[in-house]
Amino acid sequence: MKPLIVLNFKTYAESTGENALRLAMAAKQVASDSGVTIIVVPQIVDIFYISQHIEIPVYAQHIDGIEFGGHTGHVLAEALAQAGARGTLINHSERRLKLAEVDAANEAAKRAHLTTIICTNNIATTRAAASLNPDFVAIEPPELIGSGIPVSKANPEVVTGAVEAAKGIKVLCGAGISKGEDVKAAIELGTDGVLLASGVTKAPDPKEALQNLVAFV
């Protein structure tokens, strides 16, 4: 099975509004040409717009563990689903939650039939996240995020340890991923794919960067 590539748009100017749509369209084309599943994760305000223009999966960057009601400023699972999202990140290092909040968000996502990716930063948090039975965990040591130094090379033991700690839950590898060889290394360490952002979103040619990512798989 080919690996999964999850592209987090974050809140960069290069991946906001019309730029977000252009980036999503590039991901759609590369996914179609390569047969690799590419998931795009735009800002919440761009989800509906993007989901109207592409067929590849669109995920949210965050979700709150709430139900319908008086929760001003929160992100409701059902609203994401109606906007076209098929899944969501939970507990990204730039949007950290307490374990109880992670659990509530995961349950809310399941209620709305959204696929969940719980982000973790070490083996211990991976074990805790896996116990909540998400669809994926994504191991991302925060010191390597945006560094261009892939965790699969800088600290492969963290990746293999996370795979073991996840106990059957699918694992994604994040932090510093920017090249096809990084994806290949992550897969060889036992993961099911990668989570990345700036290696593509801030690349001079994002489509070319995506093509490089899938070239080794």
Label each residue range with its predicted role:
Residues T120-N133, C173, I177-V194:
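Catalytic cores of alpha/beta
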Residues V41, I117-T120, A138-E140, G174:
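Short, conserved beta-strand edge motifs with alternating hydrophobic and charged residues
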Residues K10, Q43, L80, E140, ...:
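Conserved, mostly hydrophobic/aromatic
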Residues R86-L97, F136-I149, L189-A209:
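Glycine-rich phosphate-binding active-site loops on the catalytic face of alpha/beta enzymes
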Residues P57, R86, T115, D135, ...:
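Residue-level detector of anion-binding/catalytic polar loops
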Residues M1-V75, T116, A124-P134, T201-K202:
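Conserved N-terminal beta1-alpha1 strand-loop-helix module at the mouth
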Residues T16-L23, P42-Q52, F68-E78, S93-A108, ...:
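Active-site-adjacent beta->alpha loops and helix N-cap segments on the catalytic face
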Residues D33, A83, A112, L132, ...:
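Structural motif
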